[in-house]
Amino acid sequence: MGNILDYLDWRGDLTFEQTPFNQVDNLILACFSYLDLDEIADVKNGNTLSVEELFEIFSGKEKDGEVKVESAFLQNTPILLEKMASSERFRKCRAGGYVNEILFRKAQQFSAVTVELPDGTAYISFRGTDDTIVGWKEDFNLSNGIVPSHRKALEYLDSTRRAFQGRKSGYVHGNAV
């Protein structure tokens, strides 16, 4: 059975103008939030990079040993980025607003990125919890109601709403926001 990487090989030649945004594109951008962009300052602080530019920087850092893929959740994300960057469909999309806050004492794990599609739609992707102790602790705390990451997500949505005037779309892991 095929996966999203196969989809990028198969249909990555089609732009969003040729074939509208679909459920597989939604999944690809949801997985995009799992990229470790901590060392790439240009996707933070109000700046954006095209997926193509992001891949060039990311692959340079990967070669220098600055990118470490330690989690099973992150294992295929460098491949995903490479395939997105080489596709007509995603290469010109712009990523920005990257946030990755892991606070052990608060049991808070908050990560998000916004991808601007060619039509100006801002796709907001929130990373879910992972297989770390902080991730597990936050998962357990979810059974008690609102966790600190929920508040951070609302703040992020508000700042994105102000930064991007066009349509908004997105994916929330756990559907909590």
Listing of model-derived features with the role each one plays in the protein:
Residues 173-177:
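Conserved alpha/beta-hydrolase "nucleophile elbow" surrounding the catalytic nucleophile
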Residues 1-172:
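Non-catalytic, mobile gating and regulatory segments of ester bond hydrolases
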